[in-house]
Design a protein with these regions (language model features):
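Alpha-helix C-cap/termination motif
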Residues: 48-51, 85, 109, 178, ...
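N-terminal non-catalytic accessory region
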Residues: 1-151, 272-312
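Intrinsic-disorder/low-complexity loop/linker signature
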Residues: 26, 55, 183, 191-193, ...
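C-terminal subdomain of alpha/beta-hydrolase-fold enzymes, centered on the catalytic histidine
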Residues: 205-312
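Extended catalytic-interface subdomain
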Residues: 125, 129-206
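Alpha-helical scaffold elements lining the catalytic groove of polysaccharide deacetylases
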Residues: 70-73, 78, 189-198, 211
Length: 312
C-alpha cells in the first residue's frame, strides 16, 4: 500500500456492475460484461501503486434502482468499509458516467460525513443525456448517431429485451417497474430543451417546463450543486470530445397512451462536442478543474491516467 496516499473508491457507470441480484446466475459482484472496459483501468491504477481492497475499492451497485437508493445501500457501505480497512478518515472518489451521480448524491446529501477529499468525475452527464428519454418513454432508440457500435446503447437494448421477455410485459411497462433508475438519467432542466418538432424548414423545441417526462432527482441535485464547493471537496471533471453525440432528439406526436409521452423519437441532431454518450455542456455543468480529452466515453478512462497521476 502506498504510504501517505489517500484511498480511492471507484464507482463504475451504467452496466458496470453485475451480480445474481441483477441477472441470476452471474455470480457475486463484478464488472460483468463491462470487465473489458474497467479491468484495464483498475490495472492502470494498480500500476500507480494502489492495491485492490487495500487502498483501492470498487463500489459495485444495482444500477436498475434509483440513484438515492444505490447511494444508501452500496456507496455508503463501500466508503465505510474503505475507511475501516485503511484507518483513513478521508478518501477520493473516482466516478465514471452514471457513477458520478452516485458520488454527487452522497457528497451533496445530509448524510455526508466530511470524508471525501477529491471528487473526480469522468464523463458523467450532470444534466444527463437525450437518448435516455427514448429508452424511458419508448423502450428503444430508433435512431443511431454513428456507424460505430455504442456499447452503452447495445447493452441497453439487450437488457431491455431480456427483462421484458422475462416478465412477459411490454418494454416501457417493464422498464418503469424493473428499471426505475433509468428515470434518474433522462435529461433535466439544466440540459435545456432537447426535443424538437420539424415542420417544413422550421424547428420548434418543446419547453422542458411543459414536458411530462422530467427528472426530479437531478433537478433537485443540480439546484443544490454549489454545496460541493462549500464543503471544500476538490472537484475534477474530465470529458471526452470529438465523437458524434446526440444533442437533440426529433419527435413527432404520439398516439399511444403507453409510449412516447412527449413525442415519438424519429431523428436526432448530433454534435462533435461529446464522447459519443455525453455532451460537454452536460458534463461541465459542475464547477471544478476541467479537462477535455480527444476520446470516446470509455477511452477517457485510459487517457485520463496522466491527469490522475498528477492529482492523486
Amino acid at each position: 500500500m502506498r504510504k501517505g496516499k489517500t484511498p480511492i473508491v471507484f464507482i463504475p457507470g451504467l452496466f458496470g456492475s453485475m451480480s445474481n441480484i441483477i441477472i441470476p446466475g452471474t455470480g457475486n459482484w463484478s464488472f460483468g460484461l463491462s470487465a473489458f472496459i474497467y479491468e484495464p483501468f483498475i490495472m492502470m491504477l494498480e500500476s500507480m501503486g494502489y492495491e485492490r481492497n487495500k487502498d483501492l475499492f470498487i463500489c459495485f451497485y444495482d444500477w436498475r434502482q434509483r440513484i438515492v437508493f444505490s447511494t444508501q445501500k452500496y456507496l455508503l457501505q463501500t466508503i465505510a468499509y474503505a475507511k475501516k480497512i485503511t484507518g483513513c478518515d478521508k478518501l477520493n472518489l473516482i466516478c465514471h458516467s452514471m457513477g458520478g451521480l452516485l458520488g454527487r448524491s452522497y457528497v451533496q446529501s445530509d448524510e455526508y460525513k466530511n470524508d471525501v477529499n477529491q471528487l473526480i468525475i469522468l464523463c458523467t452527464p450532470n444534466a444527463e443525456s437525450p437518448p435516455n428519454y427514448s429508452y424511458w418513454t419508448g423502450g428503444s432508440l430508433p435512431i443511431h448517431a454513428s456507424s460505430k457500435i455504442n456499447i452503452v446503447h447495445f447493452y441497453m437494448e439487450q437488457y431491455i429485451c431480456y427483462f421484458s421477455i422475462l416478465h412477459k410485459m411490454n418494454k416501457v411497462e417493464a422498464i418503469h417497474i424493473y428499471f426505475p433508475g433509468l428515470q434518474d438519467v433522462i435529461p433535466c432542466k439544466d440540459y435545456g430543451n432537447y426535443l424538437f418538432i420539424k415542420s417544413d424548414s422550421s424547428i420548434t423545441f418543446l419547453p422542458y417546463s411543459k414536458m411530462k417526462t422530467k427528472n426530479p432527482f437531478l433537478d433537485i441535485l443540480n439546484t443544490n450543486r454549489f454545496i460541493i464547493q462549500k464543503r471544500n471537496i476538490e472537484t475534477t471533471l474530465i470529458a471526452g470530445d470529438g465523437e458524434e453525440t446526440t444533442q437533440y432528439l426529433q419527435v413527432v406526436p404520439s398516439h399511444s397512451k403507453l409510449k412516447w409521452t412527449d413525442g415519438k423519437v424519429v431523428g436526432d441532431l448530433l454534435t462533435k462536442h461529446g464522447d459519443g454518450n455525453a455532451v460537454l455542456h452536460s458534463i461541465f455543468l459542475l464547477e471544478g478543474n476541467k479537462y477535455v480529452l480527444h476520446a470516446s466515453h470509455n477511452e477517457v478512462l485510459y487517457k485520463s491516467i496522466p491527469i490522475l497521476q498528477k492529482i492523486l
